[in-house]
């Protein structure tokens, strides 16, 4: 196996070809290539290989494949007691694919303490909107009092969901989006969400680090499973597993 390179590969707009992922840089971790394009063909080719674009506005397109990789196995989602209490109040409603562009705009504009500016440029908005129209990119919307207060978006290929970004305007709204998404994906037979880079927030929700090699082996299995691109609708009662169960009182028995 070749040693990791110290410079990223430079890509032309054609052909749509990425270098082998094991040639990605180790510093910065996972930077593989520069250039290419953000057409649906480029993006879908990238996600199939576990590669994603991430770059600042006005910079060239940067393609990444970090090692290790942050992922959330859906059965490992952590729903803490405080979040269960919030769910039980039933103050939120959740939809899928109703306001994709709005969710992306909210993700782009929300203030984050760990970054200056946004990487979700107009170029990215346009590219992922095209993927949404073709049934590959999806959004989760969280509503409270008929206002959009949280959500997330990402790309689905086969039975892998590649999470891109999330936002929250009120406490727990982005967590609600993830919980509802996991309930629906589980019902459809998905078992993994790619969360890309490790963060304390994602780790608290159950995300874990796995090797690039293991991640790519999962992709080879799961992205080829039959799940046609289409608009999504929420088909499950995502709150049901968390609602308080009625207490059944045992009847006293008396001996004759």
Curated annotation (Swiss-Prot):
User: What's the top EC group for this one?
Assistant: transferase
Report the catalytic activity.
N-terminal L-lysyl-[protein] + L-leucyl-tRNA(Leu) = N-terminal L-leucyl-L-lysyl-[protein] + tRNA(Leu) + H(+); N-terminal L-arginyl-[protein] + L-leucyl-tRNA(Leu) = N-terminal L-leucyl-L-arginyl-[protein] + tRNA(Leu) + H(+); L-phenylalanyl-tRNA(Phe) + an N-terminal L-alpha-aminoacyl-[protein] = an N-terminal L-phenylalanyl-L-alpha-aminoacyl-[protein] + tRNA(Phe)
Q: Pfam families per the record?
A: Leu_Phe_trans (PF03588)
InterPro entries with a match to the protein in the record: Acyl_CoA_acyltransferase (IPR016181), Leu/Phe-tRNA_Trfase (IPR004616), Leu/Phe-tRNA_Trfase_C (IPR042203), Leu/Phe-tRNA_Trfase_N (IPR042221)
> What molecular functions are annotated in GO for this chain?
leucyl-tRNA--protein transferase activity
**Catalytic activity, EC:** 2.3.2.6
Look up keyword Transferase and say if it applies: yes
Q: What does this protein do?
A: Functions in the N-end rule pathway of protein degradation where it conjugates Leu, Phe and, less efficiently, Met from aminoacyl-tRNAs to the N-termini of proteins containing an N-terminal arginine or lysine.
What family does the database annotate? Belongs to the L/F-transferase family.
Which protein are we looking at? Leucyl/phenylalanyl-tRNA--protein transferase
